[in-house]
Amino acid sequence: VLYLSSNAAPLASGLKGGACMICDCHLHTAFSGDSNTPARVQIERAISMRMKEITITDHHDRDSSFCEDNFELDLPSYLSALNTLKEEYRDKIRINIGIELGLQLHICRYLEKFHKDFGSEFDFIIGSSHFIRSHDPFYPSFWEACGSRQGLEEFFTLSFKRARAFHPFFDSWGHLDYAARYAPDSASVYSYFAFKEQIDSILRVLAENGKALECNTGGFRSRLSHQNPDTEILKQYRRMGGEHITIGSDAHAPEHLGYGFTRAKELLKQCGFHYYTIYHNRKAEMIPL
């Protein structure tokens, strides 16, 4: 792990004067089925916000044909396009090549092959648990069939099994309580303590294997109005010895890039973190908050 001081030299030139913003390590472009934003637009927005670097992490969810959008990347085309942009903008901003990898137990052989063939091509891989029994909790139909409590229990149980099986294949666990964003009764049903056993099992896998936990500020824009995961989960990860936190807006549009980062920075300090982590070539670099 590389620690960078707060006085470390900028990671990209062309940024003069004024404070630089935290690197956004979770954002989407038109390569993701649920975004219409060209990668170039996100990059230009980041430059205007004085970010030294960003990590583009478009969706790659194998076996997601049941979704309305296409979440499976043409990996060679994706990598080629981002490498071209990385070179084009090298004097203005550092572009890290990432991916948000959808984890499902029944595609274990595919995930093994993906990591063998493409793992070294990325700077950063987010591991995400999105789907439950070929349903996306984003859609109300999932909750209508099972209810909020049962749906969340199943989500966290599956997430633990996925984290345990696939932790060698990712660097940071994305939006750990993702499903709680969309559960209709989240305000009354969901809390860390209500699902402590399942959530702690996930955090233990991450902490014991040196994996990062993502602070996803997209939750600030959800009905819950808090980051994902919940503050108590961030505190528990720290108590368990977890030290790597990645920060991402989950922006699918340029106006959401870096959303809530000042708020997240102060919150993470209150949770006991002094650094956040950026990945380059799959290696962690810790930056003072």
Where are these regions (language model features)?
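Charged catalytic cores and adjacent phosphate/nucleic-acid-binding surfaces used
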Residues: 2-9, 13-27, 39, 133, ...
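An N-terminally biased module of ancient metal coordination in phosphate/nucleic-acid-related enzymes
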Residues: 15-113, 117, 182-193, 217, ...
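Structural preference for beta-strand elements that scaffold enzyme active sites
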Residues: 22-24, 53-55, 94-98, 123-126, ...
